[in-house]
């Protein structure tokens, strides 16, 4: 029998050159009479004979299926090389120019899409009218709809095969960069102080949204207001779970443009991030409940345990991967280029590991990203930190844009129009209930937050309205509805309602959120910056008074966040941070640091060469917000000051300074030396050593500035006296600033600039010697 089978297999491989997947699938049923219609005409009789031979071999069904699988695998390999093979067969020589469209079609079109996304963002942000009317996500959906109409006649999707939505591609390639970039952006004091409120909205609020929305839909269906539908209780629960996912991309963009206060921004941002994780867990539970014959309270209890296990398991895996990445980056001083690889690799490993154990990959990725920003980023260099932040931002932006374009394409380029099987009443009621339930749950939970929790400050009615109105639906809801494996009628009903919810929230609510932010007079971050020093001083005084009262009463209580911070400083940071000491965080008072940042910001805003300091101003803001360690900031300052220093030789310092001031090319060379950015060492091994050497050399050169003065002695003998020239040293330190101002302004202003720079350096020395006096003067000025 095996000899016959081998002969049959060989003959079949030779004769399957024109056989498609449908033809091979037809062979799985030996009694099928339709296999001859899908086979080539010249091979029909041959396959009939071979099929009869298979029947005579007495093969079992499992053996036959295994044989067909091998045949399919062999055929796929043959077809994969068919294009190249045909070209080699047809070509009879060396071709100078050839056309390989089928070989690079998908990759080329995808690359063009990325370029189009970049050009669209450039045009969008330079078009004031479009940016004022529509959010960016709406414009991307419209672009996808236009592309879908262009290929609307292609029923097989062959032209836009790469734009077909696949849930695995979304959850393994498009969603992780978005979640990781969001996790990296959450390192802020406002997020840490409001973590309890954010989790309350994300966990309890999401569950309440699902339960209330499902209950309202069931009641309306039971009463008969919406008519009769073939939707079961579990189908309604699944639909409520998938439309509860919040994706406020447009809202956050408006918040950044308007400049709302940090508390409102991070509450909406953090709630939407954790909301996605809770929504996916609840959706998976609803899918598992559908497979049960009868739902009991015992199954509900198991579902609650599964929810806790999935969430806690993902949290543990994320923390473990974050700790490993932080520990590994302690030893990357000699190989700086691997630092981004370690951070990205461990973060993605946390996501995949959690999914492998059926835990929440989103929770694992959030935990790993937050852990890396607090510990691993303290070990990496400033260039690696900048690379990590920019790479995640670019990938996140591309993935978000591609998701919205795919949403628009699939809206009009489905196998059937989405409105052929949709129910307008069900979709309209779903949209209204999503908005109403969101408002009700937000106001209900905010009442308890304002009454019974120790929040940082009261959440006003205007902010509650914006938080409720900003509950847009997007990519997660769109992806989850495609994963439903119910009957076509049920899936099309849910798909049409989900499309209606996504389009309404993004187009209507996303377009009007900016108007509500302005009309409701939401508290902005700029108003808080004017009194920030006073607020910090007031909070510190209240905290010290509270500690004193607690000591007198004998009852000392610390919040959970403070206890976690103390444990981190005592045990975790010495283990995971490089060169960490207990007094590292206390080397400078908080008020002194904040006052220096405020003074620097005011000086940069009042400087006529403000545009030249735009990059440094951004670095200062990152350091103040905690996104950039101050040690890295000091290294950056060292690098910039080095550009302004000139090694004084034996020639006169004043003459050399005047030549530098008059020569624009020398000034530009001092401000930006292209050879400084080139690293011959690909591993960036000696980066920190170079920075330390530059700082040491700068201090050494400061003592070499001197001038020679000729005097006459008692007996008329001339002699030369060399002494330190402080004015010349200050002039050399100010060369960079003078150069920038000399390019932008006439040369008559250079003397004033020198005097301002000397005054600034004098104030800086006074501040270093008497920091308390500087704080007092700054406070008197602010009052």
Swiss-Prot record:
Keywords: Antiport, Calmodulin-binding, Cell membrane, Coiled coil, Glycoprotein, Ion transport, Membrane, Sodium, Sodium transport, Transmembrane, Transmembrane helix, Transport. Disruption phenotype: Loss of posterior body wall muscle contractions (pBoc), weak movement of tail, weak enteric muscle contractions, severe reduction in acidification of the pseudocoelom and slight constipation. Normal oscillatory Ca(2+) signaling in the intestine with unaffected defecation period and timing and normal locomotion. Residues 745-783 are annotated as: Disordered. One of its GO terms (molecular function) is potassium:proton antiporter activity. InterPro entries: Cation/H_exchanger_CPA1, Cation/H_exchanger_TM, NaH_exchanger. Residues 19-108, 154-159, 228-235, 284-299, 372-390, 412-424, 486-492 are extracellular. Glycans are attached at residue 379. It is found in: Basolateral cell membrane. The chain crosses the membrane at residues 1-18, 109-129, 133-153, 160-180, 207-227, 236-256, 263-283, 300-320, 351-371, 425-445, 465-485, 493-513. Detected in the posterior cells of the intestine. Residues 391-411 dip into the membrane without crossing it. One of its GO terms (biological process) is potassium ion transmembrane transport. Residues 130-132, 181-206, 257-262, 321-350, 446-464, 514-783 are cytoplasmic. One of its GO terms (cellular component) is basolateral plasma membrane. Pfam families: Na_H_Exchanger. It is a multi-pass membrane protein. Residues 649-702 form a coiled coil. Belongs to the monovalent cation:proton antiporter 1 (CPA1) transporter (TC 2.A.36) family. Interacts (via C-terminus) with cmd-1. Na+/H+ exchanger which mediates the transient acidification of the coelomic space and plays a role in contraction of posterior body muscles during defecation. Probably by regulating the defecation motor program, required for fatty acid uptake by intestinal cells. This is Na(+)/H(+) exchanger protein 7.
């Amino acid at each position: 029998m095996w000899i016959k089978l081998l002969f049959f297999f060989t003959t079949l491989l030779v004769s399957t050159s024109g056989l498609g997947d449908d033809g091979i699938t037809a062979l799985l049923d030996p009694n099928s009479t339709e296999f001859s219609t899908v086979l080539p005409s010249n091979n029909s009789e041959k396959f009939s004979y071979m099929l009869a031979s298979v029947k005579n071999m007495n093969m079992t069904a499992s053996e036959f299926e295994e044989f067909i699988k091998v045949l399919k695998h062999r055929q796929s390999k043959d077809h994969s090389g068919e294009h190249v093979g045909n070209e080699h067969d047809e070509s009879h020589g060396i071709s100078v120019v050839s056309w390989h469209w089928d070989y690079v079609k998908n990759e080329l079109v995808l690359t063009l899409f990325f370029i189009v996304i970049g050009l669209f963002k450039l045009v969008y942000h330079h078009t004031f009218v479009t940016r004022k009317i529509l959010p960016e996500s709406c414009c991307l959906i419209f672009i996808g709809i236009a592309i879908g109409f262009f290929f609307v006649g292609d029923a097989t999707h062959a032209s836009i095969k790469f734009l077909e939505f696949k849930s695995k591609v979304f959850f393994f390639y498009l969603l992780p960069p978005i979640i990781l970039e969001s996790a990296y952006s959450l390192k802020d004091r406002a997020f840490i102080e409001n973590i309890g409120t954010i989790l309350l909205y994300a966990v309890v609020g999401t569950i309440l949204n699902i339960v209330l929305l499902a209950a309202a839909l069931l009641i309306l269906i039971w009463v008969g207001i919406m008519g009769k539908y073939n939707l079961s209780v579990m189908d309604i629960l699944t639909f409520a779970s998938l439309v509860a996912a919040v994706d406020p991309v447009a809202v956050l963009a408006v918040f950044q443009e308007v400049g709302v206060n940090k508390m409102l921004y991070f509450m909406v941002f953090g709630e939407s991030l954790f909301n996605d994780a809770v929504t996916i867990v609840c959706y998976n539970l609803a899918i598992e409940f559908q497979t049960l014959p009868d739902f009991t309270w015992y199954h509900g209890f198991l579902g609650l345990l599964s929810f806790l296990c999935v969430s806690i398991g993902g949290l543990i895996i994320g923390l473990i991967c974050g700790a490993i990445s932080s520990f590994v980056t302690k030893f990357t001083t000699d190989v700086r280029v691997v630092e981004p690889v370690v951070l990205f690799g461990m973060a993605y490993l946390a996501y995949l590991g959690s999914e492998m154990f059926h835990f929440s990959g989103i929770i694992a990725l959030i935990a790993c990203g937050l852990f890396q920003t607090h510990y691993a980023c303290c070990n990496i260099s400033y260039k690696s930190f900048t690379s990590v932040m920019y790479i995640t931002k670019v990938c996140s932006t591309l993935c978000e844009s591609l998701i919205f374009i795919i949403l628009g394409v699939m809206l009009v380029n489905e196998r059937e129009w989405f409105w052929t099987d949709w129910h307008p009443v069900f979709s309209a009621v779903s949209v209204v209930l999503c908005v109403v339930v969101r408002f009700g749950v937000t106001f209900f939970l905010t009442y308890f937050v304002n009454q019974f929790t120790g929040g940082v400050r009261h959440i006003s009615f205007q902010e509650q309205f914006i938080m409720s109105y900003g509950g847009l639906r997007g990519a997660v809801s769109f992806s989850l509805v495609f994963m439903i494996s119910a009957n076509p009628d049920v899936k099309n009903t849910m798909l049409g309602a989900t499309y209606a919810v996504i389009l309404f929230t993004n187009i209507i609510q996303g377009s009007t959120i900016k108007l509500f932010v302005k009309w409701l007079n939401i508290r902005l971050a700029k108003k808080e910056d004017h009194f920030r020093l006073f607020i910090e001083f007031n909070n510190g005084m209240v905290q010290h008074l509270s500690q004193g009262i607690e000591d007198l009463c004998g009852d000392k209580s610390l919040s959970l966040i403070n206890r976690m911070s103390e444990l981190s400083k005592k045990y975790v940071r010495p283990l995971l941070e490089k060169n960490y000491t207990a007094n590292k965080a206390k080397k400078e008072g908080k008020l002194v640091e904040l006052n220096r940042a405020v003074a620097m910001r005011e000086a940069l805003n009042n400087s006529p060469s403000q545009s030249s300091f735009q990059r440094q101003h951004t670095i200062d803001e990152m350091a103040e917000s905690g996104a950039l360690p101050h040690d890295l900031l000091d290294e950056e300052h060292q690098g910039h000051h080095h550009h302004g220093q000139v090694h004084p030789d034996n020639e006169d310092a004043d003459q050399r300074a005047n030549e530098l001031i008059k020569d624009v090319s020398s000034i530009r060379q001092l401000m930006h030396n292209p050879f400084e950015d080139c690293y011959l060492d690909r591993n960036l091994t000696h980066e920190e050593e170079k920075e330390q050497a530059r700082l040491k050399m700068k201090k050494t050169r400061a003592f070499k500035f001197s001038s020679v003065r000729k005097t006459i002695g008692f007996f008329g003998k001339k002699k030369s006296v060399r002494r330190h020239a402080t004015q010349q040293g200050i002039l050399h330190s100010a060369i960079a600033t003078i150069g920038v101002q000399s390019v932008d302004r006439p040369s008559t202003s250079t003397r004033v600039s020198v005097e301002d720079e000397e005054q600034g350096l004098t104030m800086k020395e006074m501040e270093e010697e008497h920091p308390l006096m500087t704080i007092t003067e700054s406070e008197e000025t602010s009052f």
